[in-house]
């Protein structure tokens, strides 16, 4: 996808980009490729592929009407090079975005990126999702949690649901639909007082299938969740 195609597709969906936003995406691409030489951020470095499979793919929650352009608090777990939250932040500057990542090198990249792109209202923390979720400054503080290709729902729910306010939503972006994954996660979702509200399917402009599972938090998460770092993965609920 050429950058111009990216701009045109957004304009067609009533999301025209300003010159500043176009420059932000362009600089994002440049820094991603430059830093990818030093630390492993992505296997995708071809410009047209980055615009399609990282930038366009990341803004799917906005294109699907799931996220409003308001000062809402969004947490991105395991964002890697900033996907999906930072492309959404460029599009919707009102969003207040927090990223937690377990690799300090990636956090360094994200801090530089935010500085270069002049993004305000972005916060980066180095550490494990399981640990921050027990901190009252993070627990039950967010309207949305996003996770793009992070883990199976059975594991992901325990890592993310505790961060949501009651009524808040987890948006899990995936490249493959796995109905059995949601069946496996049924027990975990019940224990975490949360419920699958929707499982959206759509396609990228090149026809690659994509899915977003929307999970709503119905009641406060019991204090014992999430368990200690590593446990959700080792022994899923």
Swiss-Prot record:
Q: Where is this region: Disordered?
A: 218-237
Q: Which family does it belong to?
A: Belongs to the methyltransferase superfamily. RNA methyltransferase RsmG family.
Q: Which cysteines are joined by disulfide bonds?
A: none
Which keywords has UniProt assigned to this entry?
A: Cytoplasm, Methyltransferase, rRNA processing, S-adenosyl-L-methionine, Transferase
Its GO CC terms are: cytosol
- Sequence positions that bind S-adenosyl-L-methionine: 78, 83, 129-130, 148
Q: Where in the cell is it found?
A: Cytoplasm
Function as written in the Swiss-Prot or TrEMBL entry? Specifically methylates the N7 position of a guanine in 16S rRNA.
Q: Which Pfam families match?
A: GidB (PF02527)
In short, the EC number is 2.1.1.-
Gene giving rise to this polypeptide:
rsmG
Q: What class of enzyme is it?
A: transferase
Gene Ontology terms for molecular function: rRNA (guanine-N7-)-methyltransferase activity
Q: What is this protein called?
A: Ribosomal RNA small subunit methyltransferase G
- Domain of life of the source: Bacteria
Q: What InterPro entries does this protein's entry cite?
A: rRNA_ssu_MeTfrase_G, SAM-dependent_MTases_sf
